[in-house]
């Protein structure tokens, strides 16, 4: 299987996952035009569309795409009015292109947000970004923290296929908060160079995110000290909440 990232809109990524028979899955098509172009360029034929949540920059291209390729559209209940024809929930599984995808409930960015996981790929929409977290438009910090914990239980080799190119701005925030963290600052320099060449920073591996993503480090004493939040281990979501609020105003 081969993974293709399609830059779209301002800073979105639409994902194509295809096999050797040139059949593919399309994930979160916020705009049909670049998808249709990529399908033509790579001589691919979609067999399904996967939607992680209902926001327009993830579903805006569904209708036009279906005019060209009338395929099933899998998504959470909140995407039913956005073109989803097959509603999927936590615990469901899909077999597509001979791979089984597990559905993960990942509330936070939206209440019905889901992820599609088939090792090594996790299509997680606007939940986990490289070095960052999605904004909380509908859910609570605790919900998003728990979604991050769920993702963190996956294999360290998991490829995080997030839907936006926010990596450098996330690293700028992390480096401002923990300037002595050389893993973060070294990666910040690497991504600056990458983005100057207009190359994508996605997908990212979970083992790297465990080092550079502060939202996966709520147990970190240095981070807790910086935020002046010292919760009991059972309430580490409070660190996540303080971190998310600080990022919102960065």
Swiss-Prot record:
Keyword field: Hydrolase, Metal-binding, Zinc
Domain of life according to the entry: Bacteria
Known EC number: 3.1.2.6
Catalyses which reaction(s): an S-(2-hydroxyacyl)glutathione + H2O = a 2-hydroxy carboxylate + glutathione + H(+)
Gene Ontology molecular functions: hydroxyacylglutathione hydrolase activity; metal ion binding
Keyword presence, Metal-binding: yes
Binding locations of Zn(2+) 2: 57-58, 126, 164
Requisite cofactors: Zn(2+)
SUPFAM superfamilies: Metallo-hydrolase/oxidoreductase
List of residues binding Zn(2+) 1: 53, 55, 109, 126
Disulfide bond residue pairs: none
Keyword Electron transport: no
Name of one Pfam family that matches: Lactamase_B
Pathway: Secondary metabolite metabolism; methylglyoxal degradation; (R)-lactate from methylglyoxal: step 2/2
Biological process, per Gene Ontology: methylglyoxal catabolic process to D-lactate via S-lactoyl-glutathione
Cofactor annotation remark: Binds 2 Zn(2+) ions per subunit.
Similarity section: Belongs to the metallo-beta-lactamase superfamily. Glyoxalase II family.
Role played: Thiolesterase that catalyzes the hydrolysis of S-D-lactoyl-glutathione to form glutathione and D-lactic acid.
PANTHER family listed in its UniProt record: HYDROXYACYLGLUTATHIONE HYDROLASE (PTHR43705), HYDROXYACYLGLUTATHIONE HYDROLASE GLOB (PTHR43705:SF1)
Assembly description: Monomer.
The name this protein goes by in its record: Hydroxyacylglutathione hydrolase
